[in-house]
Regions:
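Short acidic-glycine loop/turn motifs at beta-strand connectors
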Residues: 23-32, 57, 64-69, 76, ...
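Conserved phosphate/anionic-ligand binding catalytic regions in large, soluble enzymes, centered on
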Residues: 45-61, 286-290
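Short glycine-rich loop/turn motifs
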Residues: 19-21, 58, 144-146, 164-165, ...
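Conserved catalytic-core subdomain
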Residues: 1-18, 159, 213-341
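Short, hydrophobic/aliphatic alpha-helical segments
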Residues: 32-46
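Extended Lys/Arg-rich, glycine-bearing segments that form polyanion-binding/interaction patches
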Residues: 7, 79, 84, 88-202, ...
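Flexible, glycine/charged-enriched surface loops at secondary-structure junctions
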Residues: 96-98, 114-123, 207-210, 262-270, ...
Length: 341
């Protein structure tokens, strides 16, 4: 299929309407078969559960053109499983995992003309989401739901290449103990908006959220997990029940152990340790890894020696290996790559 006439090299990270999206409705205790539709609008009641009480969750994933010309997506089964966890926590009906993966493949195949070519630096971003659709005026779960998937071509999340970020230790909390920090609920992201706008006004790229209970342990940012590297090349990632289980982080841990032979620790990371790390990065679907050059803790600057001007050496190896796997340049572990076309 001929590609759309898009300036792939200068594509921003924003929404571009594509031709098809998947829609399935839940009513009377069951999901319908679902359809691909050209209609990009959502029509719901003014009193819909999602509008009144934020009953919604979502996922984020990408499709790529590999070096050998295939269109693939990366570990969609893990997105399906994570969305199931989100639905259960928000009292929403689970969209079956096998149907989730199949619907993702349908949407990507139907929008093949929008999948950026190999080497362009651009990808097709895929957004599955679900919301309560029927009128709800009392505080309770909705009875009817809609599950949708749209796709949009996006350029690199970090425009102009990989530039180390300056982040601050944040006084706001992202998640509460026994709350919803471990799921991909829309409400979590709404709560982070004030803090990120404030950070940008203060001249910072991102927030480093701490645990709400003691405010001594590193959690994550508003949309990415942390990954640290010690001076003796050990990879360390924060462990907490209120952190979203990042698929990128999980994959980087495997890459570190199995491909690079590095020692990995998943454990509590204390703020007082930050000065001792050699490298720091933010990992997630959008950018894979964004290097952090400086962390500011209430006026105290912590400069990462390997990240002030460019990505640190270990972080760079992790990034190059994982993106190599995603793009088909490096052999992937079994089940990681779902070939669509």
């Amino acid at each position: 299929m001929e590609k759309k006439n898009i300036d792939w090299a200068n594509l921003g990270f924003g929404y571009v309407q594509t031709e098809k999206r998947f829609v399935s409705n839940y009513k009377n205790g069951a999901w319908d078969e679902g359809v691909l539709t050209s209609d990009a609008t959502v029509t719901i009641s003014e009193c819909a559960g999602v509008l009144q009480y934020a009953q919604t969750c979502f996922e984020g994933m990408k499709a790529y053109t590999t070096e050998d010309g295939h269109i693939v997506t990366f570990r969609p089964d893990l997105n399906a499983a994570r969305m199931e966890d989100s639905c259960k926590r928000l009292e929403m009906p689970v969209f079956p995992q096998d149907r989730f993966v199949d619907a993702v493949c349908q949407v990507v195949a139907a929008n093949e003309a929008y999948v950026p070519p190999y080497g362009s630096g651009a990808t097709l971003y895929i957004r599955p989401y679900m919301f309560g659709s029927n009128p709800v005026i009392g505080v309770k779960p909705a009875d009817e739901y809609q599950f949708r998937i749209f796709a949009t071509p996006v350029g690199p999340y970090l425009k102009g290449g990989v530039k180390p970020l300056t982040i601050r230790v944040c006084d706001f909390d992202r998640a509460a103990p026994h709350g919803t920090g471990h799921i991909k609920a829309g409400l979590n992201y709404a709560m982070s908006l004030y803090a990120i706008v404030d950070a940008h006004h203060q001249g910072y790229d991102e927030n480093m959220y701490l645990d709400a209970a003691t405010r001594t342990k590193v959690e994550e940012t508003g949309g990415a997990n942390f990954i640290f590297v010690t001076k003796d090349n050990k990879v360390v990632t924060p462990k907490s029940s209120t952190i979203l289980p990042s698929i990128t982080r999980r994959s980087l841990i495997t890459v570190a152990k199995e491909y690079l032979g590095l020692e990995v620790e998943e454990r509590e990371v204390y703020v007082e340790e930050l000065k001792d790390f050699a490298e720091c990065g933010l990992c997630g679907t959008a950018a894979v890894i964004s290097p952090v050059g400086k962390i500011v803790d209430h006026g105290t600057e912590i400069c990462l020696p390997s990240g002030m001007t460019e990505m640190g050496p270990v972080t760079k190896k992790l990034y190059e290996t994982l993106t190599g796997i995603q793009m088909g340049r490096i052999e992937a572990p079994e089940g990681w790559i779902k070939v669509i076309k």
